[in-house]
UniProtKB/Swiss-Prot annotation:
Its EC number is 2.7.7.-, 2.7.7.108. This is Protein nucleotidyltransferase YdiU. Nucleotidyltransferase involved in the post-translational modification of proteins. It can catalyze the addition of adenosine monophosphate (AMP) or uridine monophosphate (UMP) to a protein, resulting in modifications known as AMPylation and UMPylation. Mg(2+) binds at N251, D260. It comes from Vibrio parahaemolyticus serotype O3:K6 (strain RIMD 2210633).
Amino acid sequence: MSIWQRVSFTHRFSQLPSAFYTLVEPQPLDNTRWVAWNGEFAQQFGLPAAQNDELLAVFSGQSEFEPFRPLAMKYAGHQFGVYNPDLGDGRGLLLAEIEHQNGTWFDIHLKGAGLTPYSRMGDGRAVLRSTIREYLCSEAMAGLGIPTTRALGMVVSDTPVYREKTEFGAMLIRMAETHVRFGHFEHLFYTNQLAEQKLLADKVIEWHFADCASAEKPYAAMFGEIVQKTADMIAYWQAYGFAHGVMNTDNMSILGQTFDYGPFGFLDDYEPGYICNHSDYQGRYAFEQQPRIALWNLSALAHALSPLVEREDLEQALSQFEGRLSQQFSRLMRSKLGLKTKIAEDGRLFESMFELLNQNHTDYTRFFRALSNLDKQPAQEVIDLFIDREAAQAWLDLYLARCELEVDEIGEPISAEQRSEQMRQTNPKYILRNYLAQLAIDKAEEGDFSEVHRLAEILRHPYDSQPEFEAYAKLPPEWGKKMEISCSS
């Protein structure tokens, strides 16, 4: 039986006019071999759970495959606040779409596929280091429940790629419900291709925002949806301590899914000003700046959509961003603290908690996990995470008093055991700390991919105890704290 028998393909973007893309064939790497195949995810598309040579040949661009029509998308974007018209898929190709078991279509994008007309000064390649980081982080984010692109698999080769040092060329098979970015609309606006921009908006509504089609103002409704989804994504980032590192508008998905993993980082100590991108000298994309930058990016998209949407409608949608973000962030924080009900004083509880975490350089993830285990462990386990134990005890007393006010749907008090069980499903034990990714990369560069596989599997179940992997939940060593990552990939 053919391995493709239960798989459905299409390629709607390739049916758009040529102004949107250039057809490009992948340039195969030398001696390509699997690093990882995401078998559980693959099965959701009717693909085999086990990697094989036929999948390798098709998904690494070594052999032609009829359902695929590889293309490089053209877009633009604001990078560190400056408009750059010369962007596009410089090393990635949109191969096709594949149907998920729930009926959703996912793009198949091959990253590291070679030169395209949009490669500029690049070589069209990706290296093993950055490919592993994106594979692991997209799986970690999915495990946490944060909106994200996914990874179907990755391959490595013997092809040398020259960065700060000579590295091995690799490819990532990235999956996303769309690869349409804010920058697609910006490109068409700034080049005055307004008919094409309207066509793209029509197709985006048809493919992704069907409910907007029947709205009185479909394009305004579409933009409103993009604002809401972006706010939701940022709320998750801030609640889970994720710093993206390079929030350019060409890295912003219209569906509010975390996109393009480069110099990202999860918080170790709670540090609002954390900068994970080695090249972000001004701290534009620091952790605490992410909500502001998301709104800035949405404003840039609003400007680009001004031929389609009236100014007051754009302003109305943008005005909803902060309220939606605050609402979603508060919901997530209440969940992390095991609070089902909502009272006015919760804001002060949150603020004093963040102040305490910041002043004491407390590990963000371990704090919430320790708080989740108060039914099993003494409160001292939480107190000991702080330098100022007296202040920590005072906050914990306030928190526990607040928990006493919690009741369930029928007005009965919620037990500590019930609350802790729910909190353990919200506060991860395991996150992708940069030092863990680096250890996996170091082994992989020596030809041992076992740590990549182990780490990916741990991160797919971040809320589970997994006692055999306790070492992966430890504090990072000194060399692994607050790592800044280069953009060179």
